Amino acid sequence: MEHTVKQNKTIACDVLVVGSGAAGMAAALKAASQGLSVIVAEKEQYFGGTTAISAGWAWVPGNRVGTAAGDTREEVETYLKNLAPDTYNADGVAQFLDTVPEALDFFERETDVEFVYPEKAPDYQMDLPGARLGGRAILPKDTDARILGDKRLLMQPYMSSYTVFGYMPQVGPDINEFFHVNQSVKSFVYVAKKLLRTWFDAARYRRPVLRSNGNALMTLMVKSAYDAGVRMWKSSPVLELTRGDDGAVTGAVTGGEHPARVEAKLGVILAAGGFSGNTELRKKYFPHDAAGDDHFTPTVGHGGDAATMTLAAGGRIDDAVSSVGSWAPVTVFRFRDGRQRLFPHLRAIGLPGLIAVDRHGKRFGNEALSYHDFGGRMIAHNAGEDKTFGWVIADEKTMHKYGIGYAKPWPMPRGYFYKMGYLVKGNTLEELADRIGVDAAGLTQTVAEFNVGARAGEDPAFGRGSTEYNHFRGDMEHKPNPNLAPLDKGPYYAAKIQMGDLGTFAGIAVDSDNLVVTEEGTPIPGLLAVGAAARSVFGGGYPGYGSHIGAALVFGYRAGRDVARLASARENGRGIGRPASASVAEEAAR
């Protein structure tokens, strides 16, 4: 079969994995553990993908600790059915839950990955049947980047938006100390120690060596991959899939630092993320971005490469989901030279003394919902408008304690943020409304009504602060409600929020073996898709902390486990365009 991209060098392997995030590395590690030859091709200059800049949680119900604490499969299924009832995928959920214990056992027993099992990490919709306060979401243990030796600088750095002077706080007690750094001597000392260690390491090693959150997970997975003999290629985009005369995918053509024609005997596993960075696909699938200029993604490498390669190979995009993306409202800092820096508001709008309003000065939802659910409210509320946006509003007390996005709390200076238009200030609500183009009467009425309930620890309009998950997104030391405080002390502040994401839930259509399927539903031999590249097993719902990573680890593991079996099971027991090797056949028979 003729291909459009020519490379002189041919390199053979059993499995080619495209992408080095959680899904790709899970597939690579499991495949390598079976004696298979694996290449991981990452188009970015660093390994780790979006997972490496994330909080690193993994939503994996049915894990040993949660099960021992009383969580049941029936409860999980009930919760997921209620989360996205019209798009519930019973078979996919069954595969996910069947595999969770096996996958976690593999990572903890056969790789360097270690997990922490927090007692409390509420599901995102605690008001739904089957939701639980904990036992389903886990996170990786911190690690030292020096375990990678001279390869430690090949890992994706932290996203600056998520760090405080280079340190990335963890959800829970750690981040709460940072919230109270200017209110408590204990918190100040705690934060000072963390920052001094971070700065010392950065000066000595060029980067902080303590890795936490998703960066710790990816550091441990990449270390394990090197130890297992996986060939790790950075800055090596896959330019094109190659196919045999029978239509089976036989490998790919790569460019960048490793230009080659890669012959993958058993298959290609697409784990290159979603398509939120692809303007044309956003215009087609994102409900708020028909013009392609009204969405701001902080993801790494989610340019739709896997989706476009799949479409070229005869596959399709499955958008039969309740939400095509995992929404995450952001504030956008714009530099004079046109560059942008995004701050994803994954927690902060749920803090007491902050509200979000529309162009009419009206609130449009419970700001302490998950970023995904609040983002969905924001998109729906702006339907029919030319742009999707809102404003985060705070008074002086709240700004002093918590700040907004990049504009940090006292004693950090704010002048630069005023100058660049990121933060707007008004001595009164009317003055602030005038400066941001919001209806002044609407804003003053909204704040007055909100304040009445907030003083009593209630939100009659939207029920903010009414669930344990809401409280988890607030300030647990604030009374009477961790999510509510009146806005009653000028001056007042505003920052514009727009729509971002953490990945896509619509994605490549796959069958029960993660094989990519055509419009007719026929599997394409030798081509698998996992992680954010594939349609979400949760049907567009966002069940809890780490929903992307949990599914990525589990289905990446399944793809790596099954790729040899799938190749061996083809007609006449052949691999992709050639007989499977003896070792492959033996492994598939085990």
UniProtKB/Swiss-Prot annotation:
It comes from the Bacteria. Its cofactor is FAD. Induction: Induced by CHCA, trans-4-hydroxyCHCA and 4-oxoCHCA but not by 4-hydroxybenzoate (4-HBA). GO terms for molecular function: steroid dehydrogenase activity, acting on the CH-CH group of donors. It is an enzyme of class 1 (oxidoreductase). It catalyses: 4-oxocyclohex-2-ene-1-carboxylate + NAD(+) = 4-oxocyclohexa-2,5-diene-1-carboxylate + NADH + H(+). GO terms for biological process: steroid metabolic process. Keywords: FAD, Flavoprotein, Oxidoreductase. Its EC number is 1.17.3.-. The keyword Flavoprotein applies. Signal peptide: none annotated. Forms multimers. Belongs to the FAD-dependent oxidoreductase 2 family. Desaturase involved in a cyclohexanecarboxylate (CHCA) degradation pathway. Probably catalyzes the conversion of 4-oxocyclohexenecarboxylate to 4-oxocyclohex-2,5-dienecarboxylate, which is spontaneously isomerized to 4-hydroxybenzoate (4-HBA). This is 4-oxocyclohex-2-ene-1-carboxylate 5-dehydrogenase. It comes from Sinomonas cyclohexanicum. The gene is chcC2.
